[in-house]
Amino acid sequence: MGLCHGKPIEQQSKNLPISNEIEETPKNSSQKAKSSGFPFYSPSPLPSLFKTSPAVSSSSVSSTPLRIFKRPFPPPSPAKHIRALLARRHGSVKPNEASIPEGSECEVGLDKKFGFSKQFASHYEIDGEVGRGHFGYTCSAKGKKGSLKGQDVAVKVIPKSKMTTAIAIEDVRREVKILRALTGHKNLVQFYDAFEDDENVYIVMELCQGGELLDKILQRGGKYSEVDAKKVMIQILSVVAYCHLQGVVHRDLKPENFLFTTKDESSPLKAIDFGLSDYVRPDERLNDIVGSAYYVAPEVLHRTYGTEADMWSIGVIAYILLCGSRPFWARSESGIFRAVLKAEPNFEEAPWPSLSPDAVDFVKRLLNKDYRKRLTAAQALCHPWLVGSHELKIPSDMIIYKLVKVYIMSSSLRKSALAALAKTLTVPQLTYLQEQFNLLGPSKNGYISMQNYKTAILKSSTEATKDSRVLDFVHMISCLQYKKLDFEEFCASALSVYQLEAMETWEQHARRAYELYEKDGNRVIMIEELATELGLGPSVPVHVVLQDWIRHSDGKLSFLGFVRLLHGVSSRTLQKA
C-alpha cells in the first residue's frame, strides 16, 4: 500500500490514459502488478508463454521499442489469476472466487491483536485522506501531545476487517517490525509509532510533502539530466544498501515509492512502502511473486530470488530517469513479463548515444538478466559513473561475506586461479575492495581474521539483522578456521567472477589472468588428480566432463579449464556441462 501519496488515488486514475501504443513490443512473463501502488501477487508464468520468445520479431530484433511518457504510467490491467491469488492471500474470496460471508469460518482463530498502543485517538487528530488502496488508506494527521505535538504526520490505516488470513496479519506485523528496525536512515521515511484499536492498525510516519519521484520526472519533461539523475541514484542506492545489509529486501522499488520530503529542489528523497518487504538471509532465496510489473526482476518470475531483485528494479528506475521511457513495455501484464524475461532494453535510440559511456554501462550492469552478474548497491555506489559526484561513503556489502565463505571452502587450485585474476583488477575495481577491506578493521599489520567479519556486522546491526538471521550466517563465517588475510588475498576471496564476466573487458581479464597463472601456478595435472582437487565423487564420469580442462599437448590446465575453475564447480554443474 502506498504511503504519503501526493494526491488521492482517484485523482491519479483520471490521469492514466489507455495507451494507444502498438502491440509489437516484446513480452515477458509473470510478476504481480500493483494498481495505484498496491500489490498484486501472481502465480508462476504459464509454461505456454515461453515456447518461443515473443520478444523476437520477424526482423529478429530483440529489444524494447522506446516508450516516451508524458503522463503517469498507465498501470497494467490486473489479470484475473493475479486478482484471485491476491484475494485468497487476504481471504476476501475462496479459491473458486466465491464470496466469503462476513464473519465466516475463515477468520475463526485468527489473532488480530498486535500488542500496539491503543491510544491513537488521544495522540493524533486525523485530517484528510491522501491515498487509498485495496487494503487500507493513508491520511495526514496532526500530533495532539507528546514530542510530535503540532507536527504533521502521515498515518497508514489498515482495517482489521481486511486481515482475513494469517498471512495478511503477518504481512502487517512484519511491515511494522521492519520500519521500526530500519528507521533513522536519512533516505528512509521516518517511523514514529504503531497503534491499534478494534477496527484498525495505524502506522504513524513522517509526512513527505514534496511529491513522488515519478511526479518530478514528469515535471522535468519525462527525464533527468545525468547530473541530477546521479543525485537521485546515490540516495536510492544508499538506502537500499542499508536495507540489504540488514537482510531486508524491499521488493517493490519504483519511482512512486520514493518521496521528496519537501518541494525544495534540494529536498532529500525517502524510500516508503515496506508492505511487501521481507527478510532474506544471504544464503537463502525467496519464492513468492510480488512487486510491480514494470519493475519486476526475471528471477522473481522464476520464483527464486534475493536482494539482487531490488537492484534490477533500481536499474529500471535509472533507465527511466535517463531516457524517459520504460525498458520493458507491453499492453498486457503477461506481455510485460515476457519482455522482462526475453527482451533486451533499447540502448540504441536517443538519448542513449548522447549519454556518457559510464551512464550506459551503469544501467546495463543493473539490468543484467543473470542476477549473479548484477551489481550490488554498495558496488553501484563505487561505479565510475557515480564516483566523484559524492563523498565516497560505502557501506559494508553482504556479497563479500558470501564470496569469502565460498573461497575458504574452495580447493587450493581454485584459490591460485582467483589470485591470478585478482592481479588483473583495475584501480576503480580495487577502490570498492579497499573500502570493504577497511570496513572490516584490519590490524596494524594489514591483516583481517574471520572474527573481523562478525565484528564489522555487529557495528551496524539492528533488530532486522537478527530477524533476517544475517547474524547466524555471519557467525558461520567467523567460526571457520582459516588463516588471516592480507589485502591481496582478500581481493582474491572477495571478487565476483560472474560480475567481472559481465564487463566488456572480461576477455582481457581472463586472458591476462591465465598468463599469470601459466607463469606462477600451472603445472602438469592428471584428470584423476584434478577431480580430487575439485572434490568430485566417484559417480562423476571425470574423463568425460574434465577432458577439455587439460591441454593434451603438455597435460596442464587449459584456458577453458582455467575459466571454469574460476567460476567454481560442483558435481551438478559438471554433469550439466
Curated annotation (Swiss-Prot):
Location (main, coarse): membrane
SMART domains registered for this protein in UniProt: S_TKc
UniProt: Ca(2+) 4 binding residues: 554, 556
Cellular localisation: Membrane
Domain spans labelled EF-hand: 428-464, 465-500, 501-540, 543-572
Regulation acting on activity, per entry: Activated by calcium and calmodulin. Autophosphorylation may play an important role in the regulation of the kinase activity.
Topological type in the membrane: Lipid-anchor
Binding site for Ca(2+) 2: 484, 489
Keyword annotations of the record: ATP-binding, Calcium, Kinase, Lipoprotein, Membrane, Metal-binding, Myristate, Nucleotide-binding, Phosphoprotein, Repeat, Serine/threonine-protein kinase, Transferase
Residue segments, region Autoinhibitory domain: 391-421
Residues bound to Ca(2+) 3: 520, 522, 529
Post-translational modification: Autophosphorylated.
Catalytic residue list: 252
An annotated GO cellular component: membrane
EC number: 2.7.11.1
Residues with the Phosphoserine modification: 292, 334, 558
Residues that coordinate or bind ATP: 130-138, 156
Annotated spans, Disordered: 1-38
GO molecular function: ATP binding; metal ion binding; protein serine kinase activity; protein serine/threonine kinase activity
Superkingdom to which the source organism belongs: Eukaryota
Record field: catalytic activity: L-seryl-[protein] + ATP = O-phospho-L-seryl-[protein] + ADP + H(+); L-threonyl-[protein] + ATP = O-phospho-L-threonyl-[protein] + ADP + H(+)
PANTHER family to which the protein is assigned, alphabetical: SERINE/THREONINE-PROTEIN KINASE
Role description: May play a role in signal transduction pathways that involve calcium as a second messenger.
Record comment regarding domains: There are 3 contiguous domains conserved in the CDPK subfamily: a kinase domain, an autoinhibitory (junction) domain and a calmodulin-like domain. The autoinhibitory domain (391-421) inactivates kinase activity under calcium-free conditions.
Family as reported in the entry's similarity comment: Belongs to the protein kinase superfamily. Ser/Thr protein kinase family. CDPK subfamily.
Name used for this protein in its record: CDPK-related kinase 7
Organism listed in the record: Arabidopsis thaliana
Gene from which the chain derives: CRK7
